[in-house]
Amino acid sequence: MIITILPSSANFHAIAYNEMKVEKGVATLLEAQNILGLRQEAYTPEKLRQYFLDYSSRNTHIQNAQFHVAVSCKGNEYTHQQLLDIAHRYLKEMGYAEEGQPLLIYAHHDTPNNHIHIVTSRVAPDGHKIDHAHEKRRSREIT
């Protein structure tokens, strides 16, 4: 299994990327948590992006609030459900699982390898910045 932390962003570009994959039929939104005030049938790329921007504005000191991660395996070694379970454990160990933390998890079907993408904010529900010290090292240790 490979977990890759993808580039952060001030504008939550990962949402548009993943939603474009959904529109093309090569990805599925597996899970959306804590997207308050939006019914899932009302989700659009722009509404989701705006939600994450508004949520992240709780801490104006964080310039690139997007946290975007890909979790993949060789072929079909893990099902998307197993990758989803791995993603939840990963988020907890990395500090992104506080109650109220918004997140989107997408399953991608555009390569021979099962993989998912996670999009969340580096801002915790109480407004503090989620610790990112030694993030890549900690991420490697989890896998």
Show which residues each predicted segment covers.
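N-terminal nicking endonuclease/strand-transfer module with a His-rich metal-binding environment
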Residues: M1-T143
